């Protein structure tokens, strides 16, 4: 298709714009079209989604269509939406079409890549399994992250998904010197601004790219922004051979944006009003996130669970792609235990003695066993009280409460809110700490000493102070 062919707008339905072209000059699907908004003088990018006959193409706008009118001239760029790639984008904030939104000047990238790209061939993909250490005890012990894997953070509103994501970005940048790409998909602009300021303060911004398509933006931008971020991450993996962390906050908003445009594009809705192409849309994004022989992209995806219903089609479709799941629980958050990760619902496919080692596996299973038994005893405790339990069960409760508290941890990114300095705990320290609790070596240490501690030595220090 020749670049520069011209058409004109024939219909505008919110974010969906129909454009008529000469029959012999129709743009391809996914081509980016440009139209100048007469009210603002700014160009609006339209992405071709359907060819509907008689020279008319149906497009989705990447910016507000306020001010556009029928009859306006539209130009075909002859190519899909592209994103700037390379080290020039580090430390910058971009929008869905790769424009800077941080008022820090133009991005002088040497290359731009199209955001629609095929997933790596099977022969290019890596088959080795490695653990990515996060420094967060509950994750490293019970739901270890595979390098190049996909990890889901499930939770309702306000249980701490975004804070956990911010801590991971900080740990990867400072402890691992890795690059991170953050895709803000349909989340609050305030949170994006806070994240940017937080990263400037902690000095990790130089290793990070932020790509935002926030709540106030049209569904087209929210639907495509994850692909823009992924394209930038793919460059670091494929050309520079880096291990990259891709954060998507929130993958549910990606699905939600897709369902918003789907009905306007004239597609019949499927279950719960979602788009009929839900599984395909999700697959096209997720299959590009993988390890190759050159480098890896490990993806952490915050997943909002509508009305805390995990069977909703959006979270349920995401589940199929994940290697590890971190479930955040309102019940644990209400106890004041942060991160509010549910140790029984969270899991990882690599928690296997052949991968993590026998000791790690046995300590993790031992911790879950004690916590599960404690959960089973809750009804008896509520009715009869702890005193009516057998000595063995009393010991289970005693240790479970210490484990529960030791799973909490102060975060670096929350320091200015909590006043507690953050802690990064290596995996070996985490395993050693929980092993000592399971072996009964700390049965005489007060519960309170375990709360919001780093490693087990810090707990012992606190216990000494409490006794003195």
UniProtKB/Swiss-Prot annotation:
PROSITE patterns (UniProt xref): ATPASE_ALPHA_BETA
Classification via Gene3D superfamilies: 2.40.10.170, Bovine Mitochondrial F1-atpase, Atp Synthase Beta Chain, Chain D, domain 3, P-loop containing nucleotide triphosphate hydrolases
Cellular component annotations (GO), alphabetically ordered: plasma membrane; proton-transporting ATP synthase complex
Broad class of enzyme this protein falls into: translocase
UniProt GO molecular function: ATP binding; ATP hydrolysis activity; proton-transporting ATP synthase activity, rotational mechanism
Superkingdom of the organism of origin: Bacteria
InterPro entries: AAA+_ATPase, ATP-synt_VA_C, ATP_synth_F1_bsu, ATPase_a/bsu_AS, ATPase_alpha/beta_chains, ATPase_F1/V1/A1_a/bsu_N, ATPase_F1/V1/A1_a/bsu_N_sf, ATPase_F1/V1/A1_a/bsu_nucl-bd
Coiled-coil residue windows: none
Membrane topology listed for this record: Peripheral membrane protein
Subcellular location: Cell inner membrane
Entry's EC annotation: 7.1.2.2
Pfam families found in the cross-reference section: ATP-synt_ab, ATP-synt_ab_N, ATP-synt_VA_C
Binding site for ATP: 155-162
Catalytic activity: ATP + H2O + 4 H(+)(in) = ADP + phosphate + 5 H(+)(out)
Keyword terms of this UniProt record: ATP synthesis, ATP-binding, Cell inner membrane, Cell membrane, CF(1), Hydrogen ion transport, Ion transport, Membrane, Nucleotide-binding, Translocase, Transport
Subunit structure comment from the entry: F-type ATPases have 2 components, CF(1) - the catalytic core - and CF(0) - the membrane proton channel. CF(1) has five subunits: alpha(3), beta(3), gamma(1), delta(1), epsilon(1). CF(0) has three main subunits: a(1), b(2) and c(9-12). The alpha and beta chains form an alternating ring which encloses part of the gamma chain. CF(1) is attached to CF(0) by a central stalk formed by the gamma and epsilon chains, while a peripheral stalk is formed by the delta and b chains.
Task performed by this protein: Produces ATP from ADP in the presence of a proton gradient across the membrane. The catalytic sites are hosted primarily by the beta subunits.
Entry's family note: Belongs to the ATPase alpha/beta chains family.
Name used for this protein in its record: ATP synthase subunit beta
Organism: Thermotoga maritima (strain ATCC 43589 / DSM 3109 / JCM 10099 / NBRC 100826 / MSB8)
